[in-house]
Amino acid sequence: QAAVCDAGRAPEDCAERVLTLADGVFDKISEEKSPQGVICVAKDIDKCKKIATIYSEGKIPPARETVVLLESVRDPSNIGAIIRSAAAIGVDRLILSGDCADVYNAKAVRASMGTLFGQQIDRVGDLPGVIRQLRESGRRVFAAALDSGAERLGDFPVEVGDCVIIGNEGHGLSDAVLSAAD
């Protein structure tokens, strides 16, 4: 259902309800200090798909796609900024672990500056499993990690279809993800 604090009319092709709300009620359901006057409430989709489900739905990234994987990125503003940056550099798809922040959180949507709605984003329950499947399909998957023996991005050729994993803000990447990557 959608809530509109303006004219109280739904577009003619809208099948859902439109409600006019008192300012106090509107302020209670909005996370914004100065909302724009329109709020959409929608049912959330399945946030955590198993890799087998993604494969059966044909959503494994084609080899030509540039992919960024995120593990346990918890701050919604960081998720939004990563989505925005990924769009700016031509990333085709983002794959998020199930415990990443909600991409539809108001802070994530705002930080993405609208690019969220043009990006292909998948959320998976078994990120190491996805990484293994990507590697088995011939793709290289690089882990962005602070390690004295790590190679710097730019010190080696990046090819079409290569993938990069970015980890949690405080803890980086898990051992399971690091061991699954190249």
Segments from the language model and where they lie:
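Structured helix-beta-strand junction loops
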Residues: 14-16, 137-138, 180
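Glycine/small-residue-rich loop that forms an oxyanion/phosphate-binding "nest" at active or ligand-binding sites
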Residues: 10-43
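Short connector loops at helix/strand junctions that flank enzyme active sites
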Residues: 33-35, 63-65, 159-160
